[in-house]
């Protein structure tokens, strides 16, 4: 009960503090990501111009880098914005969308890992398997792997000195020393474009309002999945789910959150 309350308290802090989340993200998910952030009470900022990197780093609460639709100008902005955020001591989230699918994506991800101090890396099991040096399969930006090596996940988090989240049927979060699991969620999330990308931004919002960044990310995972489960109950398919999911993110109450987290997992 106490642990569930701590997770919920972070969700409430997002409503109170309304963190400003700067997203340098892909063109496919911009609208959905912004709506997810608005639904939970955060403030989304979607940016595409490297010229504003220094100014934005001073005012935002967290920076999210998403390489879903890569192009050279965006890569330049990734590096500039990441360095500016590091200088201002703002947390940086990296979503390595589609890594392992092309050599270009692999090279961009390597550059980001080399030049920017990251606070969180969030990807699906295939993407994190690849980053951790395990043979994982990706098809485009989708994962064909439904498993993650907890040992390698922890080693990767320890090596990079960052929080690492690998999402799938079960989500895993590691800080290098400890690894946590989250079992909330629903299969409909895999059928709506941008749900993974939006989760990366939501995790950034949650981690920005608490000193315990690991607990903040775990709260985001649990809350996001619980909202998905609530939305799925009244949805006929992915189309109705997308709208219901935004409503659930906005309206999920503590009693519902607690019930979902404490329900036995089959």
UniProtKB/Swiss-Prot annotation:
Associated pathway: Cofactor biosynthesis; thiamine diphosphate biosynthesis; 4-methyl-5-(2-phosphoethyl)-thiazole from 5-(2-hydroxyethyl)-4-methylthiazole: step 1/1
Name by which UniProt lists this protein: Hydroxyethylthiazole kinase
EC number annotated for this UniProt entry: 2.7.1.50
Top-level class of the enzyme under EC nomenclature: transferase
GO molecular function, one term: hydroxyethylthiazole kinase activity
InterPro entries for the chain: Hyethyz_kinase (IPR000417), Ribokinase-like (IPR029056)
Pfam families, per the entry: HK
Organism for this UniProt entry: Desulforamulus reducens (strain ATCC BAA-1160 / DSM 100696 / MI-1) (Desulfotomaculum reducens)
GO BP terms: thiamine biosynthetic process; thiamine diphosphate biosynthetic process
Binding-site residues, ATP: 122, 167
Presence of keyword ATP-binding: yes
Job description of the protein: Catalyzes the phosphorylation of the hydroxyl group of 4-methyl-5-beta-hydroxyethylthiazole (THZ).
Keywords, in A-Z order: ATP-binding, Kinase, Magnesium, Metal-binding, Nucleotide-binding, Thiamine biosynthesis, Transferase
Gene3D superfamilies in alphabetical order: 3.40.1190.20
UniProt-annotated binding residues for substrate: 46, 194
